[in-house]
């Protein structure tokens, strides 16, 4: 079942340690088959160097395991909520990558300080509000998804393919699992660049709207011309 998607999700998960986005098992990637309403996700707590295609877990959009012998990632409810709320996305990544997590722990969004950021994220990468005690003590992973979508009430998830969960870490997404990992890698890099920029110049300001528009829209706008 869903062998092609399983392979894509496996390969995307294996990219996380390659790009140094994870330590031990601190992360997961999923992908969705929209037509069938099924999600493939990494199993919980399995080391990346042990993962095989047969370990991938298939769940439906209510979280029931459809295929697989292992438990799905503990973050599955977050992934499922985001898929239901963001219909344009096809893959999701969660990590505790160092620099993005630093910003999440500081409770700060990442301003668009340069064109590297603007090529991928159309403005400041937001940080959610802190979760309440009730949210944390309740259906925690589902509530994590809800606090993300609350943060995106006035944001387009296709123009802003990532978020920082306050005190937790980053989530990123894309058109498919590989694209989601790509965006997660960029998020980590711009988080590092921004932190180091503020070390050199604590008064650094975001780039102008004109420059932000130029760089984002030349890659993603209606008249995009970047690339082949």
Curated annotation (Swiss-Prot):
InterPro entries tied to this protein: Aldolase_class_II_sugar_metab, Aldolase_II/adducin_N, Aldolase_II/adducin_N_sf, AraD
Binding site for Zn(2+): 75, 94, 96, 168
Gene3D superfamilies found in the cross-reference section: Class II aldolase/adducin N-terminal domain
GO cellular component, as recorded: cytosol
UniProt keyword Zinc, yes or no: yes
Enzyme class: isomerase
A Pfam family that the UniProt record links to this protein: Aldolase_II
Keywords: Arabinose catabolism, Carbohydrate metabolism, Isomerase, Metal-binding, Zinc
EC number: 5.1.3.4
Record has Cell division as a keyword: no
Gene Ontology BP terms: L-arabinose catabolic process to xylulose 5-phosphate
Gene Ontology MF terms in the entry: aldehyde-lyase activity; L-ribulose-phosphate 4-epimerase activity; zinc ion binding
Reactions catalysed, as given in the entry: L-ribulose 5-phosphate = D-xylulose 5-phosphate
Involved pathway(s): Carbohydrate degradation; L-arabinose degradation via L-ribulose; D-xylulose 5-phosphate from L-arabinose (bacterial route): step 3/3
Cofactor note: Binds 1 zinc ion per subunit.
Disulfide bond annotation, renumbered to this chain: none
Residues of the active site: 119, 226
PANTHER family membership: FUCULOSE PHOSPHATE ALDOLASE, L-RIBULOSE-5-PHOSPHATE 4-EPIMERASE SGBE
Family: Belongs to the aldolase class II family. AraD/FucA subfamily.
The name this protein goes by in its record: L-ribulose-5-phosphate 4-epimerase
Species this chain originates from: Geobacillus stearothermophilus
Gene (UniProt): araD
